[in-house]
């Protein structure tokens, strides 16, 4: 990679760090090409990205971003996972690390907050934004459904009583 390509890559990576909701840094020593491709496809399907970058270039790209606190994590063979949704990158990375012990999560960042490996795992256990929206809609709909049942139940009971009374009068 010549200097112009490096500058372009650093600028692109800097933009990715600025736009991302969360960043996860991990060691990938020992992962096969197939496993790395699997990680990339899972992350892509979830709406995130995975990049392997030279540590020096990644450190330069982090300058001026909220995630600047994770500069110290870039030692050895590191891979960077990031996504706009704060939960996506940690969730996919942690799930993949459970299945492949060669991927070792070092830490990450969510906005200006620096996370250690346990922090990333805790973040991964939270529900995603879509899951939270679904729960909220369910919570809002439940009282309305109960109210509809409660208001229609007395009318149904009255109709049954009148129907029974009518049958009783017909039989008599």
From Swiss-Prot:
GO cellular component: large ribosomal subunit
CDD domains associated with the record: Ribosomal_L10
This protein's UniProt keywords: Ribonucleoprotein, Ribosomal protein, RNA-binding, rRNA-binding
Ribosomal protein listed as a keyword: yes
Acetylation as UniProt keyword: no
One Pfam family cited in the UniProt record for this chain: Ribosomal_L10
GO biological process terms held by the UniProt record: translation
GO MF annotation list: large ribosomal subunit rRNA binding; structural constituent of ribosome
Family in the record: Belongs to the universal ribosomal protein uL10 family.
Quaternary structure note: Part of the ribosomal stalk of the 50S ribosomal subunit. The N-terminus interacts with L11 and the large rRNA to form the base of the stalk. The C-terminus forms an elongated spine to which L12 dimers bind in a sequential fashion forming a multimeric L10(L12)X complex.
HAMAP family attached to this UniProt entry: Ribosomal_uL10 (MF_00362)
Function comment: Forms part of the ribosomal stalk, playing a central role in the interaction of the ribosome with GTP-bound translation factors.
Stated name of the protein: Large ribosomal subunit protein uL10
């Amino acid at each position: 990679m010549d200097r112009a390509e490096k500058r372009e890559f650093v600028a692109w990576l800097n933009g990715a760090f600025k736009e991302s909701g969360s960043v996860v840094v991990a060691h990938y020593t020992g992962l096969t090409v197939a496993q790395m491709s699997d990680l990339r496809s899972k992350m892509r399907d979830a709406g995130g990205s995975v990049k392997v970058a030279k540590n020096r270039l990644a450190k330069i790209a982090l300058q001026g971003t909220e995630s600047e606190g994770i500069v110290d994590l870039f030692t050895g063979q590191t891979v960077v996972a990031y996504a706009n949704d704060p939960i996506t990158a940690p969730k996919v990375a942690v799930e993949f690390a459970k299945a492949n012990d060669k991927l070792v999560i070092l830490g990450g960042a969510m906005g200006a907050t620096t996370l250690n490996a346990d922090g990333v795992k805790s973040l991964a256990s939270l529900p995603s934004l879509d899951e939270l929206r679904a729960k909220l809609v369910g919570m809002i709909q439940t009282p309305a459904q109960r109210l509809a049942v409660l208001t229609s139940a007395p009318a149904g009971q009255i109709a049954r009583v009148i129907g029974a009374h009518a049958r009783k009068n017909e039989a008599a």
